[in-house]
Amino acid sequence: MPMKLLKLHLFFVFAGLIAVSCVNSDNKALLVGDWKGAEWLAEGKPSGNDASKVQFSFAGDGGYTSDFGGAKEKGTYILRNDKLYTTPDGQLEIMVEVAKLTKDSLVFNMNRSGQSETLTLLKQ
């Protein structure tokens, strides 16, 4: 491969990596803060779970806390593309799909025991 072509190829590889890393950091900046549940659906219908009792707090340093109606946990998180990976202290990693993330809303798509669930949270 001629040197000029190699340089051009490397340029596009690095430009792509920078673009992906900027998107991930933009999304992480949107995620940081306090979130409260607004709606919890199972198979597109009300789940019977009280979404207002769900709270998350994501810190810029990769730490998080959550409260599911009194069941509290804390740990670390990684946001990668459209997936949020949380690892509660002393437990295994959990992954949820981030269907939507804006400055004021966060939507998780989850699968519990084969049942599709959607949890919508609003930034506090």
Residue ranges of predicted features:
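Sec-dependent bacterial lipoprotein signal peptides
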Residues: 1-21
